[in-house]
C-alpha cells in the first residue's frame, strides 16, 4: 500500500505541473521575462499538495476501530497501526474549537510535555499529525482508568495500593525532575494498561517550573487540590502534586475522599484547615505517610525525597523504580530531525544499540513492504513520514525492554516488558459464594461515633497510647470480591461529587468561609533566625519604604504590560467618556501637553514592583567619585539591572520581601538572557545596596 502511495504522489505532481503548462502552450508565446515571472508562481502550488499527500499517507497508516471518549476539544479513538499491528489512541483535536488563546496554549503544552517525557508510567506521545482542520496526537493506548477500577473493586489491600502509589509517585518525581508540575492529579487522569500498570495522562493544565517563579492559577479538581491552590496563594509547584498524591493514596486505601462536602465553601474550609479522619483499621505506616503529605503548610509538607525514604514506600519497591533512574532520562525523538542509532538505548553499548536498531528497521521493512535502504533513508530525512511514525512505535517497545529488564535483550522480540510485572489484584481474584447483600446505606457514620470505638479510645487515652498502637480492628477487613450496583454507584458519587467544578476555582468562589468552629490552632514557635531586615510595619508601609529607597537609589519603574488589559474596563466605568487622568488634569486647569506615558499608573499587582536600575546612577549617589576608571570599565557590559520585588505572606501577620533579578540590560538596549550571565555578584551588589538603604532612617 505504501509504495503505491509514493508512485501516486509522483504521478499526481507530474499531472499537476503539466496541467498548469497546458494553457500556456495554447496561448501566443509571451515574452521571455513574462515566462520567467509566471513559472515561479506555479512551484509553490506543488508544495501544499505534496504536504497534503504525505499527511494523508500518515493518517492512512492507522485503522480506526471505535471511539473511546469525547472531550471539550475533540474525540479520542482507538486505532491499529497497519505496519506494526499495535493499538494506539488517536486524540483528534478540532482547530475550530480552539477559539481562545488559552485553549490553544493548553493543547500546545500537552504536546510539548508529552514529547519531552519518556517514563514507563507516563502516557507516550508517538507523533503528531497536523492538518488544516485538525491536530491528531498518536498516543500510547491504555484501556482502563484507576477511577473505574476503584468503583468496581472498592478499597484496596495494602500491597495493591502501595504498588499503584509507587508507580504514580515515581512518574511524578520524573516530571518534577524535568521541571514539569502536573497540577491535576486525580484517579480519572491515571490510566491503567492491560497489566494494571499506572499511566499518567492529561498534561493540559501542567506548567513548566522556573527558578524564582511561583504559580497562582487555581486549576484541577477541588477535592484533590491543595490548600494554597484553592486559597489563591502563590505556590512553587511540586508541593501541590504531593498533596494530590496523598489524597489519591487515601482514596486507594479507604475508598472515599478525605475532604468531601456537597457545599463548596464548606469543602474549601475543610481543605484549608486540613480536617479529615483516618480510619482505625488503616495500616500504621500508610497512615503516617498520609499525615506527612496532607500538611496544610506547604513548607512543612513532605517532599518527594521524604516519601522515597519512607519505610512504607520502599517496601517491595521494584528494581526499575529504585534510584538512580538515569535509564528514563531519554527525551524522545523529534520527527522533524534525523533519527540516530544511539537514540534507542543511550546507556547501552554501541553494539547493542546497533543490534536493536537493526531489529526495529528489519521489522518495519517486513511489515510495511519497504526495502531496508529505503527505511534508513527515511529515518535520516529531516521531515516527518509514515516510516518514522512506525519506527517510534516499535522503538518504544524496545526501549521499555532495555530500560526495565536488561535481560530482555536475550528474550524473543515479541515479549512484552510489562508481562513480568505482577498484579496484586490477581492474587485475590478467587471468587467466593456470598449471601445477597442488603441495600447499601447512603448515610456515613464516623467510626468514632460507635460505642465500641469510643470506649476503646477513652481507655487508650487514659493509658497514654492513643497514637502509639492501633486499636483492635472491629470491622472485618476482608475486602469483598463482588460489589453490588448500589455500592458502585455510591463509590462513584463519593469520589467525584464536584465533577462540574473542575477549573478556575478562584473564579467559582472567593476565600473559604468557616462554617463551624474548629479546634483552635496550636501556638507556633517564633522563628529564631531569618535573612533580611526585621520590621514590624504593615505590608503597605513596608512597600512605601521600598518605594522611597528605590527613588533615592535612582531606580525607575518599568510600565506594567498587563495594566491596560486588567484596568481598561475599570477606567471606562469610573470616568464615563474620558479617562480619570484627563478629568483630573482638567479640574486642575492643566494643559494636555503632558506626555500620557509619563503619567503615573498603578501596577496591575500592587504587591509586585518591577524596576530598572541604572548602575551609573547608583555609583554617583553612593560612591561619588571614588570609583577608578578600571572599575568603571568592568561595569560597562551592563548599564542597567532589571529587578522584580514582591512581598509574600508566609503566615498570618508574617511577610517576606523577595528580590529577583529579571535580567541585565546592555548599552545597546538588549536584555541578556539568564544563561548569558555567569556571575551573580552584580545582582547581589544591588540587593545589598537596597537593604542598606532600607536600614537607614529617613
Swiss-Prot record:
GO biological process, one term: intracellular signal transduction
Residues annotated as binding ATP: 68-76, 91
Cross-referenced Gene3D superfamilies: DNA helicase RuvA subunit, C-terminal domain (1.10.8.10), Kinase associated domain 1, KA1 (3.30.310.80), Phosphorylase Kinase, domain 1 (3.30.200.20), Transferase(Phosphotransferase) domain 1 (1.10.510.10)
InterPro entries: AMPK_C (IPR032270), KA1/Ssp2_C (IPR028375), Kinase-like_dom_sf (IPR011009), Prot_kinase_dom (IPR000719), Protein_kinase_ATP_BS (IPR017441), Ser/Thr_kinase_AS (IPR008271), SNF1_UBA (IPR013896)
Top-level lineage group: Eukaryota
Biased composition (Low complexity): 415-435
EC number(s) from the headed UniProt entry: 2.7.11.1
Domain Protein kinase: 62-313
Species per Swiss-Prot/TrEMBL record: Fusarium virguliforme
Subcellular location: Cytoplasm; Nucleus
Record text about domains: The regulatory domain (RS) also called auto-inhibitory domain (AID) inhibits kinase activity of the protein kinase domain (KD). The ubiquitin-associated domain (UBA) localized within the AID dampens kinase activation, probably by restraining alpha-gamma associations.
Catalysed reactions, as listed in the record: L-seryl-[protein] + ATP = O-phospho-L-seryl-[protein] + ADP + H(+); L-threonyl-[protein] + ATP = O-phospho-L-threonyl-[protein] + ADP + H(+)
Similarity-based family: Belongs to the protein kinase superfamily. CAMK Ser/Thr protein kinase family. SNF1 subfamily.
Assembly: Component of the AMP-activated protein kinase complex also known as the SNF1 kinase complex (Snf1c), a heterotrimeric complex composed of a catalytic subunit alpha and 2 regulatory subunits beta and gamma.
UniProt KW keywords: ATP-binding, Carbohydrate metabolism, Cytoplasm, Kinase, Nucleotide-binding, Nucleus, Serine/threonine-protein kinase, Transferase, Virulence
Active-site residues, Swiss-Prot/TrEMBL: 184
Predominant cellular place of this UniProt entry's protein: cytoplasm
Disruption phenotype: Impairs the expression of the galactose oxidase gene which abolishes galactose utilization and causes poor growth on xylose, arabinose and sucrose. Impairs severely the ability to cause sudden death syndrome (SDS) on challenged soybean plants through preventing to colonize the xylem vessels and phloem tissue during infection.
GO cellular component labels: cytoplasm; nucleus
Protein purpose: Catalytic subunit of the AMP-activated protein kinase complex also known as the SNF1 kinase complex (Snf1c), a central regulator of cellular energy homeostasis, which, in response to a fall in intracellular ATP levels, activates energy-producing pathways and inhibits energy-consuming processes. The complex phosphorylates histone H3 to form H3S10ph, which promotes H3K14ac formation, leading to transcriptional activation through TBP recruitment to the promoters.
Basic and acidic residues composition-biased segments: 484-493, 564-573
Annotated region described as Auto-inhibitory domain (AID), given as residue ranges: 320-417
Pfam families named among the record's database cross-references: AdenylateSensor, Pkinase, UBA_2
The protein, known as: Sucrose non-fermenting protein kinase 1
A GO MF label: protein serine kinase activity
Amino acid at each position: 500500500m505504501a509504495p503505491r502511495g509514493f508512485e501516486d504522489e509522483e504521478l499526481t505532481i507530474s499531472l499537476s505541473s503539466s496541467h498548469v503548462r497546458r494553457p500556456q502552450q495554447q496561448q501566443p508565446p509571451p515574452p521571455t521575462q513574462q515566462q520567467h515571472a509566471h513559472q515561479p508562481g506555479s512551484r509553490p502550488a506543488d508544495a501544499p499538495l505534496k504536504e497534503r499527500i504525505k499527511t494523508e499517507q500518515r493518517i492512512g497508516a492507522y485503522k480506526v476501530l471505535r471511539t473511546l471518549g469525547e472531550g471539550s476539544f475533540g474525540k479520542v479513538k482507538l486505532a491499529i497501526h497497519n505496519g506494526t499491528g499495535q493499538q494506539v489512541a488517536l486524540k483528534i483535536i478540532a482547530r475550530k474549537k480552539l477559539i481562545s488563546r488559552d485553549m490553544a496554549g493548553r493543547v500546545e503544552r500537552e504536546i510539548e510535555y508529552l514529547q519531552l517525557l519518556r517514563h514507563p508510567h507516563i502516557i507516550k506521545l508517538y507523533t503528531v499529525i497536523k492538518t488544516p482542520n485538525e491536530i491528531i496526537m498518536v498516543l500510547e493506548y491504555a484501556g482502563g482508568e484507576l477511577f473505574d477500577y476503584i468503583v468496581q473493586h472498592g478499597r484496596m489491600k495494602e500491597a495493591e495500593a502501595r504498588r499503584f502509589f509507587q508507580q504514580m509517585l515515581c512518574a511524578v518525581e520524573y516530571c518534577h525532575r524535568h521541571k514539569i508540575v502536573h497540577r491535576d492529579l486525580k484517579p480519572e487522569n491515571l490510566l491503567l494498561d492491560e497489566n494494571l500498570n499506572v499511566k499518567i495522562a492529561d498534561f493540559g493544565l501542567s506548567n513548566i517550573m522556573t527558578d524564582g517563579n511561583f504559580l497562582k492559577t487555581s486549576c484541577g479538581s477541588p477535592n484533590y487540590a491543595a490548600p494554597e491552590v484553592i486559597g489563591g496563594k502563590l505556590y512553587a509547584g511540586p508541593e501541590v502534586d504531593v498533596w494530590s498524591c496523598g489524597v489519591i493514596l487515601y482514596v486507594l486505601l479507604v475508598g472515599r475522599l478525605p475532604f468531601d462536602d456537597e457545599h463548596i465553601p464548606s469543602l474549601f474550609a475543610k481543605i484549608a484547615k486540613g480536617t479529615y479522619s483516618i480510619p482505625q483499621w488503616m495500616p500504621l505506616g500508610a497512615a503516617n505517610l498520609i499525615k506527612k503529605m496532607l500538611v496544610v503548610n506547604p513548607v512543612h509538607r513532605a517532599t518527594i525525597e521524604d516519601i522515597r525514604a519512607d519505610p512504607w514506600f520502599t517496601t517491595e519497591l521494584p528494581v526499575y523504580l529504585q534510584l538512580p533512574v538515569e535509564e528514563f532520562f531519554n527525551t524522545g525523538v523529534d520527527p522533524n530531525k534525523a533519527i540516530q542509532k544511539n537514540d534507542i538505548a543511550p546507556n547501552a553499548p554501541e553494539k547493542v544499540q546497533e543490534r536493536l536498531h537493526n531489529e526495529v528497521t528489519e521489522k518495519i521493512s517486513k511489515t510495511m513492504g519497504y526495502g531496508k535502504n529505503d527505511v534508513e533513508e527515511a529515518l535520516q530525512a529531516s521531515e516527518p513520514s509514515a516510516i518514522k511514525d512506525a519506527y517510534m512505535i516499535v522503538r518504544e517497545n524496545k526501549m521499555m525492554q532495555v530500560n526495565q529488564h536488561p535481560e530482555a535483550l536475550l528474550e524473543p522480540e515479541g515479549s512484552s516488558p510489562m508481562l513480568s510485572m505482577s498484579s496484586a489484584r490477581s492474587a485475590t481474584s478467587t471468587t467466593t459464594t456470598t449471601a445477597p447483600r442488603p441495600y447499601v446505606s447512603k448515610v456515613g457514620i464516623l467510626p468514632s461515633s460507635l460505642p465500641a470505638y469510643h470506649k476503646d479510645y477513652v481507655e487508650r487515652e487514659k493509658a497514654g497510647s492513643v497514637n502509639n498502637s492501633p486499636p483492635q480492628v472491629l470491622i472485618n477487613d476482608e475486602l469483598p470480591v463482588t460489589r453490588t450496583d448500589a455500592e458502585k454507584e455510591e463509590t462513584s458519587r463519593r469520589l467525584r461529587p464536584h465533577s462540574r467544578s473542575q477549573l478556575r476555582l478562584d473564579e467559582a468562589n472567593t476565600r473559604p468561609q468557616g462554617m463551624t468552629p474548629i479546634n483552635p490552632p496550636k501556638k507556633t514557635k517564633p522563628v529564631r533566625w531569618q535573612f533580611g531586615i526585621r520590621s514590624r510595619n504593615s505590608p503597605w508601609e513596608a512597600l512605601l519604604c521600598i518605594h522611597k529607597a528605590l527613588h533615592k537609589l535612582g531606580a525607575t519603574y518599568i510600565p506594567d504590560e498587563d495594566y491596560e488589559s486588567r484596568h481598561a474596563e475599570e477606567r471606562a466605568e469610573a470616568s464615563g467618556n474620558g479617562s480619570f487622568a484627563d478629568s483630573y488634569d482638567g479640574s486642575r486647569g492643566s494643559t494636555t501637553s503632558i506626555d500620557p506615558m509619563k503619567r503615573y499608573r498603578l501596577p496591575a499587582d500592587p504587591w509586585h514592583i518591577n524596576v530598572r536600575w541604572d548602575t551609573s546612577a547608583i555609583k554617583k549617589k553612593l560612591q561619588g567619585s571614588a570609583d577608578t576608571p578600571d572599575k568603571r570599565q568592568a561595569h560597562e557590559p551592563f548599564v542597567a539591572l532589571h529587578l522584580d520585588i514582591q512581598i509574600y505572606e508566609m503566615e498570618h501577620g508574617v511577610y517576606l520581601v523577595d528580590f529577583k533579578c529579571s535580567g541585565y540590560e546592555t548599552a545597546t538596549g538588549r536584555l541578556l538572557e539568564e544563561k548569558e550571565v555567569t556571575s551573580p555578584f552584580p545582582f547581589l551588589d544591588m540587593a545589598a545596596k537596597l537593604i542598606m538603604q532600607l536600614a537607614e532612617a529617613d
